[in-house]
């Protein structure tokens, strides 16, 4: 047989299977397009020249890796559905005399055509929309728009290599499936596995434990740094638990309902319970995938939108003044009054001045004693680690409106954690009397509250220096130094002020930065996270659409047979339709409900992770999450309604 014969046969096969092949090709095209755009943006020289694009470029590079992994998993998963639906077709070819090597050639041309269309359209659309994405990013980070056309050879090469490799592996996978199966097995493969599912108690218990432990970690973890460590553990546990929930726990629960004879042997209950058992067995993995993808969309959109919405609030709280300077080592010995006089001589008039010296260190309090060596304490100690900020009273007296005084052995204490019960604190071997525990500290409003922390207010700078010496005796070379902080507002241009300060020999040991620069850096970071979050959310929604579409096709062909069987045993067509359609609704909306449950339990941990990125407005995150869930639920319903038309078309045609 000639090459043209195999090519024509491959084209005919693609046309005959257009209902399932076209959505797959469309998904492959969109995945290729998105991969090209992200790679192109990450390597775009015009983007790299923009102010504040370094972090954004790094975020895009991270997005490239995620998209490549997703493309491999998702294209492989959806192709497994296609190859399963075509088993009978391959069996007929074999019965008609076509050998497996001939089938291999036909599949080769089918795969090659699909790959060519995916690359050609995907890269073409990527080039078309690449500039639009570039302009959106430039607008997000407030950069100047650079006009002109840019083609990414790296993006095209990456798409050809990655998508090409995926299709090569898909081709070999299909060859293995055909090689190990006989024509008879292929012919009847779509009718296999119709035995009643068994209750899997062991896997059900494992699933419940995985979900329970994952939820427990999220709810009970208090320290944001610990939350970051446990987040990935909790995610893995919940993913495992989700798969077991749909594959084992649901079937086990339905089995228990079946054992209740008073409940089970009623017409409505009998049909719904028995039907749901088979549906859960056949659709479990797909439903779990939809649930996990839905959860990922909700989490990504809610967190990234919360971060982007809080930029101004974060900047104002973290950087309360226009210009900020930090001095370490010898620079920390500077006299603040002399510094203010120097600034005035330079023509810079500092307003709303905040200036203090501070000693920072970490540890945790145990019965009023600072524990500094926790290397042998394990994860429990990590959970307890607290930050300590020690300041002299005179530096913050005016800012905090404190009128009282302290003796050398007395301290004021403020904590965002818990009330100190002890009357004295032992810090680096020296006892300090807690004169008062403060209820509020103004300067803590600009602290990101990443961990539990204490402000220790001592009577003088001399006492602070003595505490630093005591700390050095404990930590040695790892001891922290006293830091001088000097910040102010001014009428002049911030960047010009920073430039002048850096050129002054008397104060050039300070590291100066401006509020506008810090805001630009934050915009750069959050813009990258938001862009990748929206990009990946679109990918996951696209995957959800395709899975639901294929599930509707599967349900349609299976329910066609169920309609016939139930009508033959005497059930009215209206009752059969009502029972089956209610089962379909339950099956397809269960992932959305479980995803909502996952998001609710994920809230405590995600809230703490947002603290690491300085987002501490919990109510903003709650509102954003609720909005995202409602919006996604509406999209989910629209997807279901649109894909269900395929289902009803199959059932009505065959009922």
Where are these regions (language model features)?
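N-terminal Sec/SRP start-transfer signal
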Residues: 1-32, 196-201, 210, 245-294, ...
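Alpha-helical membrane-protein architecture signal
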Residues: 3, 7, 11, 105, ...
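Short cytosolic juxtamembrane segments of multi-pass membrane proteins
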Residues: 3-5, 180-194, 557-558, 648-655
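Hydrophobic alpha-helical segments
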Residues: 113-257
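Basic-flanked hydrophobic alpha-helices used for secretion and membrane insertion
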Residues: 314-542
């Amino acid at each position: 047989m000639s090459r043209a014969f195999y090519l024509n046969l491959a084209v005919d096969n693609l046309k005959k299977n257009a209902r399932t092949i076209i959505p797959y090709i469309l998904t492959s095209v969109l995945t290729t397009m998105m991969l090209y755009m992200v790679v192109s943006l990450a390597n775009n020289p015009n983007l790299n020249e923009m102010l504040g694009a370094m972090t954004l470029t790094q975020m895009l590079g991270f997005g490239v890796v995620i998209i490549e992994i997703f493309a491999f998993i998702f294209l492989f998963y959806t192709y497994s559905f296609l190859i399963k639906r075509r088993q009978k077709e391959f069996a007929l070819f074999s019965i008609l005399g076509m050998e497996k090597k001939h089938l291999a050639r036909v599949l080769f041309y089918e795969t090659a055509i699909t790959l060519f269309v995916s690359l050609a359209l995907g890269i073409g659309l990527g080039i078309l929309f690449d500039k639009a994405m570039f302009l959106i990013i430039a607008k997000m980070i407030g950069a100047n728009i650079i006009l002109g056309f840019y083609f990414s050879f790296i993006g095209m090469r990456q798409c050809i290599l990655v998508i090409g490799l995926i299709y090569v592996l898909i081709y070999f996978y299909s060859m293995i499936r055909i090689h190990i199966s006989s024509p008879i097995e292929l012919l009847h493969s779509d009718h296999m596995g119709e035995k009643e599912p068994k209750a899997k108690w062991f896997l059900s218990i494992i699933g419940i434990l995985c979900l329970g432990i994952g939820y427990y970690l999220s709810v009970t973890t208090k320290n944001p740094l610990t939350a970051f460590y446990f987040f990935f553990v909790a995610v893995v546990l919940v993913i495992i638990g989700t798969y077991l929930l749909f594959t084992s726990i649901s079937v086990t629960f339905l089995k228990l309902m079946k054992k209740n004879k008073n409940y089970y042997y009623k017409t409505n209950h009998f049909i719904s319970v028995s039907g749901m058992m088979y549906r859960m067995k056949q659709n479990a993995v797909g439903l779990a995938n939809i649930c996990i993808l839905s959860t990922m969309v909700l989490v990504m959109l809610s967190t990234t939108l919360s971060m982007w919405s809080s930029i101004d609030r974060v900047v104002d709280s973290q950087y309360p003044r226009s210009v900020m300077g930090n001095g370490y080592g010898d620079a920390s010995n500077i006299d603040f009054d002399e510094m203010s006089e120097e600034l005035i001589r330079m023509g810079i008039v500092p307003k709303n001045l905040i200036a203090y010296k501070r000693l920072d260190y970490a540890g945790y309090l145990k019965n009023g004693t600072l524990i500094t060596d926790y290397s042998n304490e394990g994860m429990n100690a990590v959970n307890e680690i607290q930050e300590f900020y020690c300041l002299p009273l005179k530096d913050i007296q005016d800012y905090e409106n404190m009128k009282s005084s302290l003796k050398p052995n007395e301290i004021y204490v403020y904590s965002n954690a818990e009330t100190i019960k002890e009357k004295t604190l032992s810090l680096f071997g020296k006892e300090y009397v807690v004169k008062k525990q403060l209820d509020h500290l103004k300067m803590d409003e600009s602290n990101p509250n990443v961990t539990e922390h204490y402000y220790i207010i001592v009577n003088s700078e001399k006492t602070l220096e003595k505490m630093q010496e005591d700390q050095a005796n404990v930590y040695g070379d790892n001891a922290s130094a006293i830091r001088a902080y000097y910040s102010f507002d001014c009428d002049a241009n911030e960047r010009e002020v920073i430039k002048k300060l850096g050129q002054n020999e008397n104060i050039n040991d300070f590291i100066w930065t401006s509020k506008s620069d810090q805001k630009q850096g934050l915009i750069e970071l959050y813009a990258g996270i938001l862009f990748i979050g929206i990009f990946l959310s679109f990918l996951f929604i696209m995957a959800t659409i395709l899975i639901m579409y294929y599930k509707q096709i599967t349900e349609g062909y299976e329910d066609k047979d169920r309609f016939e069987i139930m009508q033959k045993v005497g059930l009215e067509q209206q009752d059969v339709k009502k029972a089956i359609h209610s089962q379909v609704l339950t099956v397809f909306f269960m992932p959305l409900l479980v995803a909502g449950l996952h998001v609710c339990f994920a809230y405590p941990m995600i809230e703490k992770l947002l603290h690491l990125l300085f987002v501490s407005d919990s109510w903003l995150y709650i509102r954003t999450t609720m909005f995202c869930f409602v919006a996604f639920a509406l999209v989910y319903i629209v997807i279901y309604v649109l894909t269900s038309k395929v289902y009803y078309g199959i059932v009505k045609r065959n009922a």
